[in-house]
Amino acid sequence: MSAIVDIIGREILDSRGNPTVECDVLLESGTMGRAAVPSGASTGSREAIELRDGEAGRYGGKGVLKAVEHINTEISEAIMGLDASEQAFLDKTLLELDGTDNKSRLGANAMLAVSMAVAKAAAEEAGLPLYRYFGGSGAMQLPVPMMNIVNGGAHANNSLDIQEFMIVPVSQPTFREALRCGAEVFHALKKILGDRGMSTAVGDEGGFAPNFGSNDECLSTILQAIEKAGYRAGEDVLLALDCAASEFYHDGKYQLAGEGLQLSSAEFTDYLATLADKFPIVSIEDGMHEGDWDGWKLLTERLGKKVQLVGDDLFVTNTRILKEGIEKGIANSILIKINQIGTLTETFAAIEMAKRARYTAVISHRSGETEDSTIADIAVGLNAGQIKTGSLSRSDRISKYNQLLRIEEDLGDIASYPGKSAFYNLR
């Protein structure tokens, strides 16, 4: 038995300089697992609650000492002595201890840190790489990366309303070559922006954050960068968007302040359809407000057969909400953010539910990240097929890409890179 003998929670800083939670779990054998949790900027209203201290004079109220205290007291007492290899039972214990629907008592940040650290300790105890511990012998597929090379919206201080403009390398034979492609396009874009006298400063997720005149201009410039790097847009590299539409939905309208537009759900559907016709866009995330299910239905009926429509704020990694979306034919993909739900067991359940319905599952970082690379192992372990973990700069993003390189090397000849087939939800 891999008995838990010690648990230590601590407050550390994330990539934005805000506090977050880290946890160490020590097993009887001396094996240790360590995990740190991320934090989002644009968040869905139905996400599990991230417990913050609210003490204005300390970190602007964003301290996490309460969550850390929960780890070091209540949670520690509840799971001490449990078998670390019994992940589902451990997560069930955490859920029962919290006792709320949204993890507001203990905090999803406290619960997730423990859930992840236990899994890491158990994998180490078993002598298995984390991805293999998660997925067994079937874990062999690397994910297609959606690389956020231009940041807008809540992730940057510029005039772009759409939050993320991403490149998606799909023609390469390996993840290593796909990563190289992304890096070369990133550097080509930097050169283009520099030549135009535009900012090459980067946003929260490592992408550039210049002031483009429109979303159209931004996408056109990315196409130029793809070609400048020696690749073919629409063949080697596709595009993806994260609208984060809940962030600019006010008074029943989608208000694109950067373009001076106020659009109804039907008009915004037309707007996105026009972009998808003009550019090789394979995926659109949060194309409607999380509560605008009628708008989501319109968007799905219009674009759902040729564009991946990802629900992030819409589904918040929650199987109850995802089940309702599947039944109503809303979207065709779910974004998986481990801190939206708060335990690994619930995260894996959402991925499996999506797959059974032929929805894709895109494993995702948050805008506030750490060096923790667990999501890379989840992406491979669960054969998710797609990952979103930022641009080709900032070590908090690169740590996930580098872990995927190590995993691909470890898998050797059995490693596969799905390319366009990762989008099995499109017909």
From Swiss-Prot:
One of its GO terms (molecular function) is phosphopyruvate hydratase activity. Catalyzes the reversible conversion of 2-phosphoglycerate (2-PG) into phosphoenolpyruvate (PEP). It is essential for the degradation of carbohydrates via glycolysis. Pathway: Carbohydrate degradation; glycolysis; pyruvate from D-glyceraldehyde 3-phosphate: step 4/5. The active site is at 205 (proton donor), 337 (proton acceptor). (2R)-2-phosphoglycerate binds at residues 163, 337, 366-367, 388. Mg(2+) binds at residues 242, 285, 312. One of its GO terms (biological process) is glycolytic process. GO terms for cellular component: cell surface; extracellular region; phosphopyruvate hydratase complex. InterPro entries: Enolase, Enolase-like_C_sf, Enolase-like_N, Enolase_C, Enolase_CS, Enolase_N. Binds a second Mg(2+) ion via substrate during catalysis. SUPFAM superfamilies: Enolase C-terminal domain-like (SSF51604), Enolase N-terminal domain-like (SSF54826). It catalyses: (2R)-2-phosphoglycerate = phosphoenolpyruvate + H2O. Its cofactor is Mg(2+). Gene3D superfamilies: Enolase-like C-terminal domain, Enolase-like, N-terminal domain. Its EC number is 4.2.1.11. Coiled coil: none annotated. Pfam families: Enolase_C (PF00113), Enolase_N (PF03952). It is found in: Cytoplasm; Secreted; Cell surface. This is Enolase. Keywords: Cytoplasm, Glycolysis, Lyase, Magnesium, Metal-binding, Secreted. It comes from Burkholderia mallei (strain ATCC 23344). Belongs to the enolase family.
